[in-house]
Amino acid sequence: MSFTIKFCSDLHINKYYPHFPSVKDLFDTNDKFIADICILIGDITHFEVIKFYKKFLQYLSPYFSLLIVVPGNHEYYCNGTKKHSMKELDQASQTLTRDIKNLEILNNKYIDIGDVRIFGSILWSYLPHTTPYRKLPIYNDNYEMLTRNEFNILNYSAKMSLENCIRQSKTDGKELIVATHYSPTFDMYEVDDNNETKDHMNYWYCNNMDDLINEDNVKVWLFGHTHTPYRKNINGTIVMSNPYVSGYCKGLGVNIN
């Protein structure tokens, strides 16, 4: 089965409220049909402004057979006067898939398209104790900002989900496309002999998962978050980012044959 994918991340459309980027702004065509699949890889805007989020997705959805959202960290930011837990924001996001029939939200989940499996995850990064910690407006069930330990639990859960998907996809004979908000590699930064970043602040943006990139059934890995355009073939796996906020390429996409 063959299909086409367009992808982008880090639109941060809250900056344009009440407007948002047009199809002409995002893609190299404004034809009635742009591609089979569009993957939005996080930091589109906040789930707390769910009506604005929905309006943007409803605008985009007719141009694609399938629209996939992989949440980012900013989806869970609470910048208003009211605190919302991550669980509450996840519940709010379910109204999107209820009202937009060709929309899938993938966070530690996958969808099969013929013999290809698409796995999506925020893929929160691991924050070692050597990395300075900064509290973000993301809240747990007690309406307290997430701790370092809670971030690392999210990282562990995402990594386990991805590893299980890679393993199961091999059993099922599926080629795998991975879409994660956080980067799976420190490759765009200066690293040591263990592929670990020399600047510990970069742990806020990336994971050291080059071993998973190298899995033979992982064919494409798309990511966001770093605001750094990136395109590289790593041992046969196409690894790319396409952030709207920096160096965005309207024509960038993936053809799956």
Model regions: which residues?
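Active-site neighborhood of phospho(di)ester-bond hydrolases with catalytic His/Asp-centered motifs
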Residues: F7-S9, C38-D43, I68-N73, E104-N108, ...
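Active-site-proximal beta-strand elements of phosphoester/diester hydrolases
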Residues: S2-H12, D115-W124, I177-H181, I238-Y244
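A basic- and aromatic-enriched beta-loop-alpha substructure that forms the phosphate/nucleotide-
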Residues: L66-I138
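N-terminal active-site segment of His-dependent metallophosphoesterases
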Residues: M1-V69, E75-T81, E88, N255-N257
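Active-site-proximal loop/helix segment associated with metal-binding centers of metalloenzymes
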Residues: F119-H200
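Active-site environment of divalent metal-dependent phosphoester hydrolases
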Residues: H12-H19, T45-K51, H74-H84, Y110-D112, ...
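Short amphipathic alpha-helices and their capping/turn segments at secondary-structure boundaries
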Residues: K24-D31, K54-S61, N102-D115, M160-K174
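Binuclear metal-dependent phosphoesterase catalytic core
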Residues: S2, D112, M201-N202, N207-V220, ...
